[in-house]
Design a protein with these regions (language model features):
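Charged DNA-binding/catalytic regions of mobile-element recombinases
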Residues: 1-139
Length: 139
């Protein structure tokens, strides 16, 4: 889950097959980071798990508006698709992994780097976390 404000990866889950618990766990993890008064919009593709009643109900309970891309239109998800492209070129294609567990450990390290250390020109030369922290300090 990526925050459009600063490009920070808020949370993620990984599994060997697409099951609803991956999405529900990710949503629960994101909820723990939110203040009750936060007003949000969550955008996704039209994957079956994002259309399930429990998922939609969880969003409604938190007052979160749901937005879904048009069917078969990757451009509606350009921000996350761009992140995946960056992650592949900076992380996936440059490394070899001995096991799934090794991959998961290295992915966690990369996400931490991406959020805390990797600077972005559009964030005035700051990392996503630095940018968010800076904005909170001057607000």
């Amino acid at each position: 889950m990526l925050d459009l404000y600063n490009g920070e990866i808020i949370t993620y889950t990984i599994g060997s097959r697409p099951v609803y618990s991956l999405v529900s766990t990710m949503l629960d993890q994101a909820f723990k980071r939110l203040a009750d008064e936060d007003t949000l919009l969550i955008h996704s593709d039209q994957g079956w798990h994002y259309q399930m009643k429990p998922y939609r109900h969880a969003l409604e309970q938190r007052g979160i508006k749901q937005s879904m891309s048009r069917k078969g239109n990757c451009y509606d998800n350009a921000v996350i698709e761009s992140f995946f492209g960056t992650m592949k070129s900076e992380f996936l294609y440059l490394n070899e992994f001995d096991s799934i567990e090794h991959f998961k450990q290295e992915l966690s390290t990369y996400i931490d780097y991406y959020n805390h250390k990797r600077i972005k020109a559009k964030l005035k030369g700051m990392s996503p976390v630095q940018y968010r922290t800076h904005a909170q300090q001057i607000a």
